Amino acid sequence: MTEKLAILWPEIFLFIATCLVMITGQWPSRAIRQFTPWICVVALLLAFFGAMTSPATQGMFPAIIPYAKMVIAFVGLLILLLLSGTVDRQIEVDVDKGKLFQSIRSNRGEFYAFFMFSLTGLMLTASADDLIWLFLALELTSLPTYIMVAMSRDEDSSLESAVKYFFLGALSAAIFLYGFALIYGATGTTDLNEIAAVFAADGISSIGMMGLLMAVIGVSFKIAAVPMHFYTPDVYQGAASPVSAMLAFVPKTAGFIALMFLLGTAGWGFGPSGGHLPVPIEATLWIMAALTMTVGNVLALLQSSVKRILAYSSIAHSGYMLVGIIAGPGLPGGPFYENGLAALLFYLFTYGVMTVGTFAVLASLEHRNGKEADHIDDIRGICKSHPVLGWTFVITVLSMLGFPPLLGFIGKLGLFTAGIAAGHYALIVILGINSAIAACYYLRLVAVSYIDDSEKSKDPVYATPFFLRPTAG
């Protein structure tokens, strides 16, 4: 019990902050309301250092827990800075004009509380050692995001996206929960380590295999992988850009961590020389990875909305990351570049940073009527009209492409080397072809942002003071 409590300090810090922001967000004093995001900042910093100093565990992947929590806290802090000022902007403008603050109209407290609840669930996912714990952690990660999508913008499109997101999320939860039930029926336990021991001793029964396959398909919704990807472009476009950035990282990270734990029960010791998942699972993931990266990249070519391009790009990145899952951890004590799970975790970090940077630029560009920049013409020439935002956008987009020597190149290189080391040459060829396809729409975004067209629009975009967002929110 003491050991379990020691590794849960990051979650405890976040939960305490969640309780506090629900109070401060509704406080009549504006100074206290503006302090709300800073409570989250302190909690995330404490969670980061708590994860850094947490003791080693005896779980399935003992090195994953502290590293994953540090990544979650760091990227969560970046997302928090982006989320600040997303809600209650008009309410604060009305207060400046002398109107009385009405807490019943304010969403600030709930908005930050839902964000912190989601991050708490994500960290609990990384700490999971039981199927019931894993299910509850995944749902705690996902449920707040449905509400955040709905409240992020005062438009019908946000509500429509939230409803679609919720019902598909409920369907996926039912699928992977049924898979968990089959796994329990096949092994008689919900403890992940005990499940792995049963599978190792007695083999994987047909019921256990069916349970694993259903769990994988259900969790694929979290990572926006084919065939559970349909909601992604509509939800990303309907939500405010900061919330879209959160959706691109938080549920995806939870899904991949859950996949690592679930597939770790079966192990990668199959095949003539080991290093492979059971054939039905590996074949399912192989097809899913190839289709996900191909569908995402091809459909991104057809879009004129920047957020829809980034949504399909997010789908494609899930396909890339599945290569790390398929490759597995490699030989015990083997080099880093052969460890697919290590490459996956590093890629999640790089992807989180790149995604937040890209959506931060979109969140900082608004039309005169207050609507966010979204159409590809809205970013035309921003390298010249708004140099800091423009070049930030260019660098993050090139990094998502994997352009050397940027961070995204290093992350993608790890997936390539791990896949080659595991012998999945055909999948690596598909990954290379898809990277070339992705270059078409990524370079299109770069070219448009650099080209200066004085006749571009009768409704130009204006840069908002992004560095003041934390004080505004």
Model-identified regions with their sequence ranges:
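Alpha-helical transmembrane segments of multi-pass membrane proteins predominantly involved
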Residues: 1-473
